[in-house]
Design a protein with these regions (language model features):
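Hydrophobic alpha-helical transmembrane segments of membrane transport/permease proteins
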Residues: 31-66
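N-terminal signal-anchor/first transmembrane alpha helix
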Residues: 1-41, 117
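Generic hydrophobic transmembrane alpha-helix motif, especially the helices
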Residues: 60, 64, 95, 104-167
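Lipid-exposed faces of alpha-helical membrane segments in multi-pass integral membrane proteins
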Residues: 20-34, 87, 91, 95, ...
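Transmembrane alpha-helix signature in integral membrane proteins
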Residues: 70-105
Length: 182
């Protein structure tokens, strides 16, 4: 285990591109988490006297066509995007793992029906399917998250099911069943 960690650390130190992008992603995460403290203006505040104002000391990236601070909008947008991404991954993981575990453990008709549903969802590219579902649900961050979770849980379900089926075949599980402990 320590050997793998050593190799990963060595890769991180030797590969300049990896190091650059790691620092860039870390900086983006920090800036987006600190958005409420870094943004000096309300990102939704309309100021018609500052329409398309150039960048300056007060408005670092200037203003848009209705006078809103572009830098503040960028920070708040990044924070919302990262929140949505983390939420989609967490929900997809929890839902997919639960469904996959139940299917792998129960087997039979439940497993067959759910895995055919997984096959049907995975037959379409995730992005196109998510956009289609979001179009049916309507606009908004909540509906976008729901659409992405609907397409994202399938990978976790398939992986969890495979692991459960693998563990069910292990000798110690069979021995526990034979001895009446299961």
């Amino acid at each position: 285990m320590g050997e793998k960690t050593g190799r990963t650390g060595k890769l991180a130190r030797s590969d300049k591109r990896f190091l650059f992008w790691s620092v860039a992603v870390l900086a983006l995460l920090i800036f987006s988490l600190l958005a409420p403290h870094l943004a000096s203006h309300d990102p939704y505040e309309i100021n018609l006297s500052l329409v398309t104002a150039p960048p300056g000391s007060e408005y670092w990236m200037g203003n848009d066509y209705v006078g809103r601070c572009i830098f503040c909008r960028l920070l708040h947008g990044a924070a919302r995007s990262i929140f949505a991404a983390v939420l989609v991954v967490m929900l997809s993981f929890v839902i997919g793992t639960l469904i996959g575990t139940v299917c792998g453990y129960a087997g039979g008709r439940i497993d067959i029906i759910v895995m055919r549903l997984v096959d049907a969802v995975q037959a379409f590219p995730n992005l196109i399917f998510s956009i289609s579902v979001a179009a049916m649900l309507g606009s908004g961050l909540k509906n976008c998250i729901i659409a992405m979770v609907i397409t994202g849980w399938t990978q976790y379900a398939r992986l969890a099911r495979t692991k459960v089926l693998d563990i069910k075949k292990k000798t110690y599980v069979r021995a526990a069943r034979v001895s009446g402990m299961s």
